[in-house]
């Protein structure tokens, strides 16, 4: 499993496809994050629009990315969310923590 990464200007983008609910998907997110982070990007946008299910394991990996960026005065953003993922983010108040990238 591998997630697409892209650099556009000062932002790095990670497109997560499939569910974010296993060690395999979490490891793929970590690798994609490191790929963008190691290229000097401190504003990273997670595109979770294709994710149907996210569990505590996936949330933990998202928070790991957030904490690492915050330590460097960076920002972790998300594309506009929908469905179960949006409900989960709202329930955990992650929608207050992670700004939405509408670009």
Question: Residue spans of the language-model regions?
Answer:
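STAS-typified acidic loop motif
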Residues: 2-31
């Amino acid at each position: 499993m591998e997630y697409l990464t892209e650099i556009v200007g000062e932002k790095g983008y990670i497109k997560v496809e499939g569910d974010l609910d296993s060690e395999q998907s979490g490891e793929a997110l970590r690798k994609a994050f490191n790929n963008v982070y190691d290229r000097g990007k401190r504003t990273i946008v997670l595109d979770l629009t294709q994710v149907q299910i996210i569990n505590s394991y996936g949330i933990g990996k998202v928070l790991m990315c957030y904490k690492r960026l915050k330590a460097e005065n960076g920002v972790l953003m998300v594309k506009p969310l929908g469905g179960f993922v949006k409900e989960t983010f709202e329930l955990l108040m992650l929608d207050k923590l992670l700004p939405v990238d509408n670009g």
